[in-house]
């Protein structure tokens, strides 16, 4: 039977760990609420610009932007959004597994793949396995700024503009609710043509002033930026939700483990007392 002193030490250690996990759970709840508010605040802009782009894909444009053109696929790029910190359950692992499966399908067709990475977890993982990384950024924090993301967005857009990439995907976690976060891979370039059936009966053309090419260049760049930013904010909400659930599970596991150890401790203490009584009785009998 384990020594009572050792068991007591383990119980104290688990109690201290429980305090930490409980505190982290409460912090995650607070951060998740703030991130959800930020996500909802940025959603109207993302939805409106998305709707405008959908109309543009159906319009008779004076200038047909390259972002609407499908071309033969030789190279594709992924913008991968992960977390900077751990203790978020299987959030990053599930995302990376889905991405690796998708990359494998392209590799089997002889397609070259290049990555732009957001977050320490993606940077560490994909550099470790030897993936071709052409841009990366870390330290997004809990209050993401578009200025922090502009660099990798420009790198990928320039690669697409120069026909170095033929498709561009955005990889992130979709926040469904507190207990559900779904990894998703969305094509952002060329602009997908699905889900536009409902607009066909009510679309319109725009009048461009002063120049359609200039306006479309700016508008489509803003669209890509909004897509990436919205995904980063949504991924942060997913991170905090996953961390909250993970820390809650850790706290509950600590409670269960402490109960089990207390039972073991009481048995060990009881055996120790019984042994001492037996020794006293044996000593008294000898006298």
Swiss-Prot record:
Keywords: ATP synthesis, Cell inner membrane, Cell membrane, CF(1), Hydrogen ion transport, Ion transport, Membrane, Transport. It comes from the Bacteria. One of its GO terms (cellular component) is proton-transporting ATP synthase complex. GO terms for molecular function: ATP binding; proton-transporting ATP synthase activity, rotational mechanism. Coiled coil: none annotated. GO terms for biological process: proton motive force-driven plasma membrane ATP synthesis. This is ATP synthase gamma chain. It comes from Baumannia cicadellinicola subsp. Homalodisca coagulata.
